[in-house]
């Protein structure tokens, strides 16, 4: 599994804090941290000739976690008194990342003297004292610890996670339940294959036509069809199998993956180039999320020993 990616946003005036936070987050970890202003070709968040909002929307699909740094940038009049608050764009970015990544995967690293609006309360807040390095470092470490706890437990609401859950509930779970309840795979003729495995084949990359992609993979494998009763429903499940010496391997190609391409294309701005490196990177990331979510749900239900997820070359 690739390293988790973290986005750090701040005002231009407080880039030094973002850089300090990056060093702490990356020290002895597998996190890949990108600050909003980094302009290396493979890490740039805001690019020339691109709109600010489009770049932000793209960024929310690239990262696993978001940290926004709130410092004493602007004075505002609040109910007749003067207050200090972060830049409006920092608050906007915080809301955008929370909306995409969820509350547990975002944090607001904020100066303790800043007034926090009631709408912001309830998210992960890490307070620090201005010009106090220890205070700032401890606040960043608390965020890192919070993100560490998410690494092995999060199943989020990205398109891939939703599709993996649907695929699991409609195929993997009833198939595994049938195998367990019947002591194996019971075909419509009454024969039981006692040793069963579900082999889920995942393409290396997603194309615009996933169905044709799977047909090409399927053509390389000699299988036969088998039908068995769908647990709890008045219909059968038809599967492709490889049977040998009383053992059976169910071969499945999750064509539901085509929904990732469709969902991502609708989440991104209309003028986003679907042939770009960025788009391919987002698709690849969603493919990883699909596999990750599928494994986590199977492990949760105790079916992980019945499934094997492989890429198309295995």
From Swiss-Prot:
Keywords: Antiviral defense, Hydrolase, Nucleotide-binding. Coiled coil: none annotated. 3',3'-c-di-GMP binds at residues 171, 234, 252. It comes from the Bacteria. CDD domains: STING_bact-like. One of its GO terms (molecular function) is nucleotide binding. It catalyses: NAD(+) + H2O = ADP-D-ribose + nicotinamide + H(+). Transmembrane segments: none annotated. Pfam families: CAP12-PCTIR_TIR, prok_STING. Its EC number is 3.2.2.5. Residues 5-129 form the TIR domain. InterPro entries: CAP12/PCTIR_TIR_dom (IPR019302), Prok_STING (IPR046876). NAD(+) hydrolase activity is strongly stimulated by c-di-GMP, weakly by 3'3'-cGAMP, very weakly by c-di-AMP but not at all by 2'3'-cGAMP. Self-association of TIR domains is required for NADase activity. Residues 160-314 are annotated as: STING domain. GO terms for biological process: defense response to virus. The N-terminal TIR domain mediates NAD(+) hydrolase (NADase) activity. The cyclic nucleotide binds in C-terminal bacterial STING region. Comparison of structures from 2 different bacteria suggests that cyclic nucleotide binding causes domain rotation to form a lid which seals the nucleotide-binding pocket. Upon binding to c-di-GMP the STING region closes around the ligand, which is bound by residues from 2 adjacent subunits. In the C-terminal section; belongs to the bacterial STING family. Effector protein of a CBASS antiviral system with NAD(+) hydrolase activity. CBASS (cyclic oligonucleotide-based antiphage signaling system) provides immunity against bacteriophage. The CD-NTase protein synthesizes cyclic nucleotides in response to infection; these serve as specific second messenger signals. The signals activate a diverse range of effectors, leading to bacterial cell death and thus abortive phage infection. A type I-(GG) CBASS system. Homodimer. Forms homodimers; in the presence of c-di-GMP forms filaments with an ordered array of parallel-stacked subunits. This is CD-NTase-associated protein 12. It comes from Capnocytophaga granulosa (strain ATCC 51502 / DSM 11449 / JCM 8566 / LMG 16022 / NCTC 12948 / B0611). The lineage of its organism: Bacteria, Pseudomonadati, Bacteroidota, Flavobacteriia, Flavobacteriales.
